[in-house]
């Protein structure tokens, strides 16, 4: 799909930042309007992250206009908002391929463009990496500048504050731009405040500020008075001095949709020494009313009709696993006031909207703070409550030490509802849930369950909730199979279920690839086992299958290395059972973006692929 660039005459003149910087500044508002419309048209036809990009159009234009990218380093935190950046950096004609197999990466990606200096996807990494680049630039001595753009959500994470504290300590030259879209632009982000921001960022003010400090350095009372006067001046129109306490020179807030103010302020700040923080106010979804009204709903969108102002409904009548979890959570909370649900800023994605409204006293959104979420849950468990941590597989990686040190070592009854296990689709390498079975399986005291359908998911959540120790239920992104939901009951810990009896080959399946494995088993006349538990492994059943069959095949949507299949291998070797084993799962690579079924087919994890791998191995 390609758009008629003739409809965007100013944008047509700026295929890359070099061309953008040749435009007269008077044309920048027109460029922003066209860029926003181009983004709207492209995403509506191809799907993708939407509201965040609309909110940073003016900022993106201003940054590339003022800074000499790619020589100067521009870093986008997380990267949801980077579509305008990609459009302006030579990828305009390919933006409609974003998040698709073999298309543009969903986030800034070093291998895709020299303008993407940091590969991202997870939040709050930009300032740490940016500080490292700033230190390297100082050693290089060529005047290279470093700019990090981070949102008001991502900056709350501990890693961001750790980086700012370090930056303030070593006083490296860098600019952090806080993109604050939590509220609409208010009156105090108007003329006076924009004027003050330009004044405070100007060279004359900076010179007087530093000169005054030096002149009165021997007179502490006067120096303190000057500092208090400066803070009082800022305090009339800006937020707290938190960033100043961390060692940053704070400027703002300014209107993030006034491209002229942004360019002038950035020009003023470009040559300032030491760590700088520019606070801008933006509106997520800017320029498209439905997205402005519901930025969360329009965060990532399927194809839609811009004229309708609505998103298409899901075509599937089957519930998602996230919905199954959310319904179970509400059902359990209705009977048990000790349940406490914890999420690190993933309420919508984890299916917890209804729970948060109906049980607000039992719901904790701890923001983007996975480490805190896990240890907070440990504290709740020590206090006699029953915490349930709802977290994506890829984000649990960020709290690995807390999982071991604060939960497992103390054998605390914390249930982890791990969403997005396995292939997630369009978000690619940074979001695949490829490693959780591997990194949890080696932790003592953990019970790890992998349901084959939505009914088993409910039963496992119930079982894990009532287990007196740490437990994890790991389920995928997407819809269930249509399984009948049975009354909740405890499953026997560490016991699998024989689903089909065959000959010679026994397929041991962990998780929701069971339906695909079933088809392969029927075609091969193989035995099929729903293993259910990754840990503790059903050793008795595995050894029985080894005794009755010529070969074993393990199937899982997790990295083969260290995964559930590795557990089977370890058991057989420990018991001196010399049975050939084929491990089928995710290969030793970071799986790129693509539709889930598309990538399963490519990786040999659909029914045909499983059968093909087995037949090739036996040939």
Swiss-Prot record:
Swiss-Prot/TrEMBL keywords: Isoprene biosynthesis, Magnesium, Metal-binding, Thiamine biosynthesis, Thiamine pyrophosphate, Transferase
Record's catalysed reaction(s): D-glyceraldehyde 3-phosphate + pyruvate + H(+) = 1-deoxy-D-xylulose 5-phosphate + CO2
Keyword Membrane: no
Entry's EC annotation: 2.2.1.7
SUPFAM superfamilies: Thiamin diphosphate-binding fold (THDP-binding), TK C-terminal domain-like
Entry binding sites for Mg(2+): 152, 181
Needed co-factor(s): Mg(2+); thiamine diphosphate
Tree of life domain: Bacteria
Annotated source species: Yersinia pseudotuberculosis serotype IB (strain PB1/+)
Record-linked Pfam families: DXP_synthase_N (PF13292), Transket_pyr (PF02779), Transketolase_C (PF02780)
PANTHER family according to UniProt: 1-D-DEOXYXYLULOSE 5-PHOSPHATE SYNTHASE-RELATED, 1-DEOXY-D-XYLULOSE-5-PHOSPHATE SYNTHASE, CHLOROPLASTIC
Assembly notes: Homodimer.
Chain residues that bind thiamine diphosphate: 80, 121-123, 153-154, 181, 288, 370
Function of the molecule: Catalyzes the acyloin condensation reaction between C atoms 2 and 3 of pyruvate and glyceraldehyde 3-phosphate to yield 1-deoxy-D-xylulose-5-phosphate (DXP).
Assigned protein family: Belongs to the transketolase family. DXPS subfamily.
Any GO molecular function: 1-deoxy-D-xylulose-5-phosphate synthase activity
GO CC term (a single one): cytosol
This protein's encoding gene: dxs
Lineage: Bacteria, Pseudomonadati, Pseudomonadota, Gammaproteobacteria, Enterobacterales
UniProt pathway: Metabolic intermediate biosynthesis; 1-deoxy-D-xylulose 5-phosphate biosynthesis; 1-deoxy-D-xylulose 5-phosphate from D-glyceraldehyde 3-phosphate and pyruvate: step 1/1
Note describing how the cofactor binds: Binds 1 Mg(2+) ion per subunit. Binds 1 thiamine pyrophosphate per subunit.
GO BP terms: 1-deoxy-D-xylulose 5-phosphate biosynthetic process; isopentenyl diphosphate biosynthetic process, methylerythritol 4-phosphate pathway; terpenoid biosynthetic process; thiamine biosynthetic process
Protein's name in the database: 1-deoxy-D-xylulose-5-phosphate synthase
